[in-house]
Amino acid sequence: MYSREETQRLKREFWVSFAEKYSRKWILYDTKIKDFSFKFFVDNRKAQVLIDIEHRNDEKRLQYFEKIEALKGILEEEFVKDLVFEKEFYLENGKTISRIWVEKLDVSVSNRKYWDEIFDFFNEKMHALEMFYLEYDAFIKDIE
């Protein structure tokens, strides 16, 4: 078991190593849609690439989610398979968001032997989600 400082150092090293291996600018928060973002997540059990829709207005949040959900067939056939769509996802802080994600199980940020596998997963899945978004962003952004 690592101390808190060791865990923080290891996570920092993980992200620096990822940035060195895949040194490119990701869209992440630069979607031009308020509270709509792409994210990476990793812990000691899994790695995930996510789309989080966190709009404070539930109606708008659901509209954005439903836009992507309407494209689910195209998204899964042409870009990323095995996506999970969660219209009402509850964060630990009690906030309700909409989340779409793909995950790789049985990997760990604390074990360097998994890092390349996680990095490749992150790159492949995020790149595919970004390509989908860039192709369909006008449709996704067009809500009432």
Kindly give the residue locations of the regions a language model identified:
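Charged, terminal alpha-helix-loop-beta segments
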Residues: M1-E144
